[in-house]
UniProtKB/Swiss-Prot annotation:
The record marks 116-117 as: Cleavage. Residues 32-500 are extracellular. This is Fusion glycoprotein F0. A lipid is attached at residue 523 (S-palmitoyl cysteine). Belongs to the paramyxoviruses fusion glycoprotein family. One of its GO terms (cellular component) is virion membrane. Class I viral fusion protein. Under the current model, the protein has at least 3 conformational states: pre-fusion native state, pre-hairpin intermediate state, and post-fusion hairpin state. During viral and plasma cell membrane fusion, the heptad repeat (HR) regions assume a trimer-of-hairpins structure, positioning the fusion peptide in close proximity to the C-terminal region of the ectodomain. The formation of this structure appears to drive apposition and subsequent fusion of viral and plasma cell membranes. It comes from Newcastle disease virus (strain Italien/45). Its main location: virion. Residues 1-31 form the signal peptide. Homotrimer of disulfide-linked F1-F2. Residues 117-141 are annotated as: Fusion peptide.
Amino acid sequence: MRSRSSTRIPVPLMLIIRIALTLSCIRLTSSLDGRPLAAAGIVVTGDKAVDIYTSSQTGSIIVKLLPNMPKDKEACAKAPLEAYNRTLTTLLTPLGDSIRRIQESVTTSGGRRQRRFIGAIIGSVALGVATPAQITAASALIQANQNAANILRLKESIAATNEAVHEVTDGLSQLAVAVGKMQQFVNDQFNNTAQQLDCIKITQQVGVELNLYLTELTTVFGPQITSPALTPLTIQALYNLAGGNMDYLLTKLGVGNNQLSSLIGSGLITGNPILYDSQTQILGIQITSPSVGNLNNMRATYLETLSVSTTKGFASALVPKVVTQVGSVIEELDTSYCMETDLDLYCTRIVTFPMSPGIYSCLSGNTSACMYSKTEGALTTPYMALKGSVIANCKMTTCRCADPPGIISQNYGEAVSLIDRHSCNVLSLDGITLRLSGEFDATYQKNISILDSQVIVTGNLDISTELGNVNNSISNALNKLEESNSKLDKLNVKLTSTSALITYIVLTVISLVFGVLSLVLACYLMYKQKAQQKTLLWLGNNTLDQMRATTKI
């Protein structure tokens, strides 16, 4: 059988072409235009990039807590180092014991292993209650057991080195970096200097620095007395332990400098202690860092609402707090799966909800389609700063301008006032003085009024009031009904008795019978009359014919 030539495009190339065609059909994302919405009490406060992440990258940082002194200065630093060593052991022994109990719980197989595992967790938690997060942390600790054992196998060489930071790769299944914040101090102060220091000064310097580091360790592990092995360490705590050397590990894990500051603020970089050795004062921490994917065509837009003035009172716009826009599609974004930073939104999944046509039209700039709720009270903050200018409801608060002096009044029916440096340089609101530097250009809509049909009831108190009005209307209707019943009761009861009703029915039937008979009789008489008319007409015609015949003769 002859083979046919194939013209199929390879799968990777097909995917690239499909992606390119898809992107070419999607218009580049532009943030929501807040200029037509500001005067309606809807303020766009900012945008954030939307990223997808998964916590898949792990590495280990080995903290060398006890520094190695130069040989010629060991005697001078012996006393503070011994005191520091004893304090370290006292502080971190509960942590090491907790880690060992959990890791040793996997030595038994089957159901007994599961019971020992849960028992070890509960034994490490105050009040005997283990949360799901603590059980997850314990599972991660079990998985890192082999890596911790490999690190302990190298503990002597790690403790003996004078390097402040170096990679440890011998026999380890994941990236590990040994760091020593105190070793860095010793290297900077004593190893790399030609200055001669007396023994007393060396003792003082080492003692002060060790005490400061102990304070940081107490700050890191102090809140973990109840469950020291199951509480994740924050990125701030990790930096306290490792100093600036922490950046080396994060860079090795693939965290770029452009993402580092944002990820630090997100709290997604965490660490869990996996080992502590009191002999060499080695502390092992497993670092979890997210793997981040950028969604270049998506951003989150944050919206805030002001209490605006309407003819029905104060009200606020019914719009989502966060929306996302891709091309011409605008949908509400659920941020419950996301971690926020100043510039980014890191999400494990993207969940959006479609908006009603009215809200979509409202956010697109058609303020007459916006709906408002009478749920804002008089104590709600009636102003908001936006790019050096102020949007304020000057009917709820006094907008006092100090430069030039005067009171800014809000026109009747106007929802809010847009105040910039052209109308006031220094503005006072509720005792707060603001110097304005921004401006609302001609693209901002002003003097927007909210119609009565745009204000609806959504608050519990307002709904209760409306229900009260409905109840009053029902009560009035019941009163009218009772009044009607009382008037009916005054009528003659005999007229409405059963015998009277029977009499009425009989008379009605008789009347109908007489009516039918009369109709039949009338029809008969009309028929008879027409028959007589036909007879007379026939006789008349015959007589006329006879007379015509006689005349001809």
